[in-house]
Amino acid sequence: MAQNGKKKIGLIGGGQIGGNLALLAVQKSLGDVVLYDIPAAEGLVKGKALDINQLAAVDGYDCRVKGTTDWKDVAGSDVIIITAGMPRKPGMSREDLLEINLKIMTDVAGNIKQHAPNAFVINVANPLDAMVFALHKIAGLPKHMVAGMAGVLDTSRFKCFVAEALGCSIRDVEALVLGGHGDDMVPLVRHSTVGGVPLTELIAKDKLDAIIKRTREGGAELVGLYKTGSAYFGPAASAIAMAESFLQDRKRVLPAAALLEGQYGINGYFFGVPVQIGAGGVEKIHTVELNDGEKAELEKSFQSVKKTVDSVKL
């Protein structure tokens, strides 16, 4: 908690996602923000902090952002969101980032262990499932105080494409995407509805298959369009949804990468499933009844995650 009694949010990585996280956090009055990056990026984080603070009078918020390169400023954070790492570029998979981002995560996790061991930590860095596994191991965080942001974003993309296909309000689309944050993620079509009507009754199978494919390739589509980086608005909003539920004890049920201990037949790996997030962190892990086809798809997704995680050398 900040010295002024407000909640304190530590953002590790001052790039596109980090900057948007800082803006969203103060606009929602979630707490004061510390935007951290390495010394080479000192001007970047201090500039973004100043820019956002000068916007306060326009939007009418009283929370503040501090740009820093000193981990001591992160100490006492209630929640930490990690975005530090190399972003994807055209032609790269999330797994291609493993070696370089693992080195970054090792440093970040060690500093969290030293300076903010009681924070609820949300990882956004890719490859998501492997990075959150490394974070948990290195920082020694309790299993309920660490999670990976993936499912909120993947589900949001799926809902977006469904709403576009039907020309309906996205608010009426209920859907869930499980599994790893990669090409084998599992949109649960059978459990998806629009205004209570099953999705399968509204969209033909071939069109649904195309939506599923586009959802799985959603990150790559944006990488191809941006050319020099990856998505940042969506990831930032998704991570803030998780942080907000923790900070305000909203107990929202959101798809996120959590440590499984037998659920869905998986043990000892972080995997995307519906979880309840409240003041206690990941308070519950919910299981969804799956048919044989869905189980097979989820197992395929898990094997992809397992292969990447098992290659992590700590």
Curated annotation (Swiss-Prot):
**Active-site residues from the entry:** 181
Q: What is its EC number?
A: 1.1.1.37
Q: Which PANTHER family match?
A: L-2-HYDROXYCARBOXYLATE DEHYDROGENASE (NAD(P)(+)) (PTHR43128), L-LACTATE DEHYDROGENASE (PTHR43128:SF16)
Positions bound to NAD(+)? 13-18, 37, 101, 124-126
List GO molecular-function terms, semicolon-separated.
L-lactate dehydrogenase activity; L-malate dehydrogenase (NAD+) activity
Q: Oxidoreductase: present as a keyword of the record? A: yes
Catalytic activity from the UniProt record? (S)-malate + NAD(+) = oxaloacetate + NADH + H(+)
From which lineage does this chain's organism come?
Bacteria, Pseudomonadati, Myxococcota, Myxococcia, Myxococcales
Is Amino-acid biosynthesis among the key words of this record?
Answer: no
Q: Which GO terms describe its biological process?
A: lactate metabolic process; tricarboxylic acid cycle
Q: Which protein, by its recorded name, is this? A: Malate dehydrogenase
Record: residues binding substrate: 88, 94, 126, 157
Per UniProt, the keywords (alphabetical) are: NAD, Oxidoreductase, Tricarboxylic acid cycle
